[in-house]
């Protein structure tokens, strides 16, 4: 079902990470985040949305499905995880588009503990006035957003100008782009930022676990 994959950490804490628009669960970023979070004691589930399954099968790029379809597919994944792990404490999230879909799904699901987003698409690239903030004002669960300072979908300066609810926490990583990758001149690395993201998400999850 949707190439559902899990990396277990022998814990009752589970997080689901959905991929971004252009790369599925096979991408190095998704595999790296799954590994780093698991090392810190969280079971990590990943999956491919239906359009990405088709893209892999046909070996060609396919645009994402409409948002309602993505939300429904994510909901089906959660149902399957609940079937396999009925006692799991469950957080959801994802990279960029996947994180946005998770926020919409959390608005419909009271049993989701919280949401973790890696690079929230606050607006389309080059269209800073076309913001996607409504769902962040609707969601009731705690949300952590890990954002690169230079993210073209919403940089640190732009985010500072938003009036976000108190349950939304944004952590900006120095000089990071939409994939948390800093420039060489910064002296930092994408791997360091991914480890930092995993650490902050783990603290977020464990701090709210029963």
Give short role names for the model-derived ranges.
Residues 152-158:
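Conserved alpha/beta-hydrolase "acid-adjacent" motif
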Residues 101-105, 126:
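Hydrolases whose catalytic domains are alpha/beta-hydrolase-1, hotdog thioesterase
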Residues 89-94, 118:
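Short beta-strand immediately N-terminal to the catalytic nucleophile in serine-hydrolase-like folds
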Residues 138-140, 145-147, 151:
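Short beta-strand/loop motif that positions the catalytic acidic residue
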Residues 1-88, 182-184:
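Serine-hydrolase catalytic machinery in alpha/beta-hydrolase-like enzymes
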Residues 94-98, 102:
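Gly/Ala-rich beta-loop-alpha elbow adjacent to hydrolase catalytic centers
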Residues 111-122:
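A conserved short beta-strand
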Residues 176-192:
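Catalytic histidine-centered segment of alpha/beta-hydrolase-like enzymes
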């Amino acid at each position: 079902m949707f190439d559902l994959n899990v990396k277990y950490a022998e814990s009752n804490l589970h997080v689901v990470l959905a991929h971004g628009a252009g790369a599925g669960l096979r991408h190095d970023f998704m595999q790296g985040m799954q590994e780093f979070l698991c090392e810190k004691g969280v079971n990590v589930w990943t999956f491919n949305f239906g359009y990405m399954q088709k893209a892999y099968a046909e070996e060609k790029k396919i645009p994402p499905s409409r948002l309602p379809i993505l939300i429904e597919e994510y909901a089906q994944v959660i149902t399957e995880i609940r079937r396999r792990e009925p006692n799991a404490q469950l957080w959801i999230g994802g990279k960029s588009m996947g994180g946005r879909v998770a926020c919409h799904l959390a608005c419909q699901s009271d049993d989701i503990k919280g949401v973790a987003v890696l690079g929230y698409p606050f607006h389309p690239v080059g269209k800073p006035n076309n913001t996607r903030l409504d769902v962040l004002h609707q969601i009731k669960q705690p949300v952590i957003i890990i954002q690169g300072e230079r993210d073209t979908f919403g940089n640190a300066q732009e985010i500072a100008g938003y009036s976000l609810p108190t349950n939304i926490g944004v952590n900006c990583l120095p000089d990071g782009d939409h994939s948390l990758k800093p420039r060489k001149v910064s002296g930092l690395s994408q791997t360091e930022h991914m480890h930092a993201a995993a650490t902050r998400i783990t603290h977020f999850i464990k701090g709210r676990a029963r």
